[in-house]
Design a protein with these regions (language model features):
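Exposed alpha-helical structural elements
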Residues: 22, 31-38, 50-51, 65, ...
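Acidic, low-complexity proline/glycine-rich segments
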Residues: 3-53, 131-136
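Active-site-proximal alpha-helical scaffolds that flank and shape metal-associated catalytic sites
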Residues: 95-185
Length: 185
């Protein structure tokens, strides 16, 4: 049985045997950490075609691509207060509040590093469709802010957790940028 609610629904409708005789393989139960890692891998920064193809770390356009990525990351996450700061204000549970405060303190250094790289990489390269890209990033920033400022139970802390999990990949991109710019992380 995968989900208790599914078993209840099957008993209520008399379909319990039909569910157990399904030709589809049963999903293996996974832990929360595995599910979150899977979501980050499939939908996070690392899933972007430029990241998967290595377009940010090698090739003739790598530095240009990195400059775009760094500037857009700075637009998304370089402001204060950011996702984690806003979510920390919403946290009422003592355990999540402590984690949020620690994460917000740590993110101060990450934001400073991001700003330092954005400054070192120079201006945003001029590209056809740049205005549309900036508008899309501004819309993403607004959506991220809405999640981080939400009063819905778990929404703000979920946004902070998602950013923290995805930051592992983002930090790799920042480290690659720092290396290419001869900066020390």
């Amino acid at each position: 049985m995968i989900f208790p609610g599914l078993a209840f629904a099957a008993r209520a409708t008399g379909e319990e045997n039909a569910l157990s005789q399904s030709t589809q393989p049963l999903l293996q139960p996974r832990g929360v950490a595995e599910m979150l890692d899977s979501l980050v891998a499939s939908d996070g920064t690392g899933a972007h075609p430029h990241v998967r193809a290595g377009a940010l770390s090698s090739g003739a356009q790598a530095m240009r691509n990195l400059a775009h990525a760094v500037h857009f990351l700075c637009l998304l996450h370089g402001r204060h207060p950011g996702v984690i700061d806003n979510a920390a204000r919403k946290a009422v549970d003592p355990a999540s509040r402590q984690w949020m405060d620690e994460a917000a303190d740590a993110f101060v250094q990450e934001r400073a590093f991001l700003s330092k790289i954005a400054s070192a990489v120079g201006p945003v390269p001029s590209t056809q469709g740049q205005a549309q890209c900036e508008a899309a990033v501004a819309a993403q920033r607004k959506a991220i802010d809405m999640l981080a400022e939400s009063d819905r139970h778990g929404c703000a802390v979920g946004a902070a957790i998602a950013l923290t999990l995805d930051w592992r990949t983002i930090r790799v991109l920042l480290d690659i940028s720092a290396q290419r710019l001869d900066m020390t992380p």
